[in-house]
Amino acid sequence: MKNLYTQLEQDNVPKTLTLLLQSIVGACTEIATRINHGALSDVLGSLPDHNVQGEVQKKLDVIANNILIESLKKNKQVRAVASEEVEDIILCNSFGKYLICFDPLDGSSNTDVNGSLGTIFSITSASAAQTEVSEEDFFSTGRSIIAAGYVLYGPSLMLALSTGSGTHIYTLDPSNNNFMLTHPNLNIPEDTNEFSFNLSNQFKWPENVQKYIVDLQLGTDGIRKKNFNMRWLGAMVGDMHRILCKGGIFGYPEEKNFKYGKLRLLYEANPIAFLVEQANGLASNGTTSILDTVPSSIHQRIPVFIGSKNEVLLIEKYALGK
């Protein structure tokens, strides 16, 4: 069984990018240790502050964010980073080759109940010109991503990663602290009978999305002619991990009070879309590919429908009223 770095070498990943991934993976391993200690080290619960998104911050949100930033600042290949938890970009090394976007702790509302958690990240190339980086340098589409992944803090510590040559899943071997390739070349089934939507928000969604949900709940007697199962873990990483492995569709539509959806384009939607499309799936905002969206803010939000190809294409038809 190959380890992470053997696979990266086989995929001809540049040494500089490998070293950057090593920094990210190392930081996530440290985050996993802090999560595992949980209540034993008083890292659960909320803080009195809100983050830039207006959301209540969990203690582990801040801990995970600080661990990642500290690790990335030490890496000379990093020009700048953008974090979901921080209002502005963070400048690192003026000669660095890479820009990194990350959500340090996806699903942090699950921290107090020992639920699914994850870290999501993507990497793009910085401008070759040695100029000061600004927020606008992060405004490239997801097609410019050169590597993306997530770490799932579950029963096993798992890394899903793509450097543009397919999507692979690695599992941490605690006996030697190496990530081993356990699920190579993922291939999401084109059809599915599983969906991951938070139906408690259904009344807030556009009518066409509501109709899609109603139709798939009618079972074998309805227009879809089959039964669907619902899965919802309260963490995008957890739901998407299942979809990468077994197929399905994840949806977080726009809502009445959130015209552009709630998930962030740079920190959540783009990295997951990159992984999914590298695994034969699709990722859409309801009408067009997420990866073709040009950002206008580092904290831009976007509606998300990601997963099995035929199901994503179908929901686009519903969005068009077909």
From Swiss-Prot:
Q: Which biological pathway?
A: Carbohydrate biosynthesis; gluconeogenesis
Q: Quote the PANTHER family the UniProt record gives.
A: FRUCTOSE-1,6-BISPHOSPHATASE-RELATED, SEDOHEPTULOSE-1,7-BISPHOSPHATASE, CHLOROPLASTIC
Q: Which residues bind substrate?
A: D106, G107, S108, S109, N198, K262
Question: A Gene Ontology biological process annotation?
Answer: fructose 1,6-bisphosphate metabolic process
Kindly list the GO CC terms recorded for this protein. Answer: cytosol
Q: Any idea what this protein is called?
A: Fructose-1,6-bisphosphatase class 1 3
Q: What class of enzyme is it?
A: hydrolase
- Species this protein is from: Pseudoalteromonas translucida (strain TAC 125)
Which reaction is catalysed here?
Answer: beta-D-fructose 1,6-bisphosphate + H2O = beta-D-fructose 6-phosphate + phosphate
Cofactor(s) the protein needs = Mg(2+)
> Any idea which positions bind Mg(2+) 2?
D103, D106, E268
Question: Which residues hold Mg(2+) 1?
Answer: E84, D103, L105
Its keywords, alphabetically, are: Carbohydrate metabolism, Cytoplasm, Hydrolase, Magnesium, Metal-binding
Q: Self-association or partners: how does it assemble? A: Homotetramer.
Molecular function terms, GO-annotated: fructose 1,6-bisphosphate 1-phosphatase activity; magnesium ion binding
Main localization category = cytoplasm
Localization per Swiss-Prot or TrEMBL: Cytoplasm
Mention any Pfam family matching this sequence: FBPase
Q: How is the cofactor bound?
A: Binds 2 magnesium ions per subunit.
Q: What is the E.C. number?
A: 3.1.3.11
What's the family?
Belongs to the FBPase class 1 family.
